[in-house]
Amino acid sequence: MKRLVLGAAASLVLASAALAEEMRLAVTTSFHNSGLAEVLLPEIKKDLDLDVQLLVVGTGQAIRLGEAGDVDAILVHSKKAEEAFLAGGHGTRRREIMYNDFVFIGPEGDAAGIAGAEDAAEALQQIADAGAAFVSRGDDSGTHKKELSLWASAGLDAEAFGPWYRAVGAGMGAALNTASGMDAYIMSDRASWLNFGNKGGLALLFAGDPVLFNQYAYIPVNPEMHGHVKHGLAMQLEEWLVSDKAAALINGYQINGEALFVFNAKR
């Protein structure tokens, strides 16, 4: 009888340990490719007993998942799209978490000469003038939206470009692989580039223009629109993401001695 009681108690302990809370978070491919999730998720599990299931997609698709109530929160990087999401009543509030920047990558020989450009608009104009191979995400991601806005700011229409401009409809890692294989120019977030293992003959050629600022924000899905979402868990995760511990982990995350993100949440 004693063995049965002990066995039942052990089963209850095991069952309790197995029943950690779960929530679904849509994140961008650029965030996932950075490797930061592998640092944050185990600490979230340890501190909150919360399993965060990531759906890795572009910002546009992440927002559509939020609008459909298929996730509990989103972590994305396209402010205009985020504000439209909130205006439509799909999210409760937008909380800025961290930032990095976009950079222009290209062949080490830099036939278009963008390394000497004064700003991002000039760099893009030089690529277009040279007809140099350029790979675009082409996937409605935050990175793709930003790239298109930069072409437009330079007075250029990406839809009118010739065969030198290749939209691949893929995530950041796959797009970087394509650029590496083609020896082409590409715009990437800095974190994905630093964590990319197949650089080949590519190099970081241009960065530093303030227009290349890249802010990441967290938005819980509105439970009044989607009653089934786990809003309480989404809010717990938000509070963790703006904590001192999260700040230390985000600011301390480096590759080859270079920081990938800067924490800037207001608390």
Q: Residue spans of the language-model regions?
A:
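Short, conserved active-site loops that position catalytic residues or coordinate cofactors/metal ions
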Residues: 69, 100-101
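Sec/Tat signal peptide C-region and signal peptidase I cleavage site
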Residues: 16-20
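Positively charged n-region of N-terminal signal peptides that target proteins for export
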Residues: 1-4
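Bacterial N-terminal signal peptides
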Residues: 7-15
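Acidic, polar ligand-binding/catalytic clefts
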Residues: 73-99
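Serine endopeptidase catalytic core focused on the charge-relay Asp
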Residues: 104
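Exported/periplasmic ABC-transporter solute-binding proteins
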Residues: 21-51, 55, 60, 64-70, ...
